Amino acid sequence: MDNALLSLTHEQQQAAVEQIQELMAQGVSSGEAIQIIANRLREAHQNNTSENNS
């Protein structure tokens, strides 16, 4: 399991869903949209983690 994604608040989850839906409305497949948003969330989590460890 991906701990970074498990720790999302309800608001963050809702924002992710909305971003996925927006990508799908632009013609991106659902799987690709989920992957794009998941990667963005992982990157943001890694950046936050590295900033907190500095």
Curated annotation (Swiss-Prot):
It holds the Pfam family UPF0181. Belongs to the UPF0181 family. NCBIfam families: PRK05114.1. The lineage of its organism: Bacteria, Pseudomonadati, Pseudomonadota, Gammaproteobacteria, Pasteurellales. HAMAP family: UPF0181. This is UPF0181 protein APL_0863. Disulfide bonds: none annotated. It comes from Actinobacillus pleuropneumoniae serotype 5b (strain L20). Signal peptide: none annotated.
